[in-house]
Amino acid sequence: MSKPPILTLADITKRFDTQEVLSGFNLSIEDGEFFTILGPSGCGKTTVLRLIAGFEGADEGRIMLNGQDVSKLSAEKRPVNTVFQSYALFPHMTVFDNVAFGLKMAKVSKPEIAERVKEALATVRLSDFATRKPHQLSGGQKQRVAIARAVVNRPKVLLLDESLSALDYKLRQQMQMELKQLQRKLGITFIYVTHDQEEALSMSDRVLVMHNGQAQQVGTPREIYECPNNLFVASFIGEINVFNAEIVESLSDYRYLAAMDGFKREIHADRRFEAGDKVHVLLRPEDLRIEYLEDAPDRPGFSGQVLERNYTGQTLDSQIQLQSGQTIMASEFFDEDDPDFDYSINQKVWVDWVHGWEHVIKAES
């Protein structure tokens, strides 16, 4: 028998005054997973976090945490701790006292406090910083103190509210790796809220993408990136090229002949379509292949010209206008040993992709 989820939100509705920000919202999170709630500003992700923490109450629905209905429990009675974006460290206290604060409030014995704080600081690699004050710490160190203060209480779930957004890019990348390693080491459930797609993809076991208070898709980072449910998910997670097409006929299970941009081409889909169905063929920039027009192979593809090119060190990114007028993005890994691996502005090119790399969804109006 499989274990029940550590956290379940069932048919949650939340209103602020007359505005309904969540309606019939459902979510299940497994014990011990790193789960990220991802979406643009105003999508409802922070509201979900606050409902889990107990900082807000749901107008309708139920929240189950570790088998207990906590819908009516106050925040301090829930086995949950939150790491805020600001870290919320007490400036007049040492690192040790900041981490020990929750245990002291819970009237834990002094010997146990000392042992648990020592263990928590060792976990986040700050054992030598116990006597320092917050102003003597770097941004990354403050982040780790905030996490130590949260995990020292041994919560079932740790909530992190955009807690890396204040860090610079390189430190943020470093902390992404450290957070994931720490989560594995602790074995507790992390629920992370962010608008940053890179953070979500790099750290998470699973990701929930939200928009306008609705769950758009839940899946692994790879599922979210490679097999988006709809155009919002496809466009919110990285760059995407969208080609309109119509199913001409079914060739076999999940293989179809499609008409697109003046030619017919075989496509592969992970769902069933009928002849005449309008579809979107989705391709990431890195899925496209570019050739000089005069070197175009003898198979269906797009012709166009290069509008802009950008060398990033690892890739050569090209903006291409197709004959249809549509503008697309293509990204190819740079090959310094290929003297022809470059394109000039207005260069005539031919664009293709490897069969099976496309993702096909029902057309949206």
Swiss-Prot record:
It catalyses: ATP + H2O + polyamine-[polyamine-binding protein]Side 1 = ADP + phosphate + polyamineSide 2 + [polyamine-binding protein]Side 1. Gene3D superfamilies: 2.40.50.100, P-loop containing nucleotide triphosphate hydrolases. It is a peripheral membrane protein. This is Spermidine/putrescine import ATP-binding protein PotA. Belongs to the ABC transporter superfamily. Spermidine/putrescine importer (TC 3.A.1.11.1) family. InterPro entries: AAA+_ATPase (IPR003593), ABC_SmlMolc_Importer (IPR050093), ABC_transporter-like_ATP-bd (IPR003439), ABC_transporter-like_CS (IPR017871), Mo/tungstate-bd_C_term_dom (IPR008995), P-loop_NTPase (IPR027417), PotA-like (IPR005893), PotA_ATP-bd (IPR017879). Keywords: ATP-binding, Cell inner membrane, Cell membrane, Membrane, Nucleotide-binding, Translocase, Transport. ATP binds at residues 39-46. It comes from Hahella chejuensis (strain KCTC 2396). Pfam families: ABC_tran, TOBE_2.
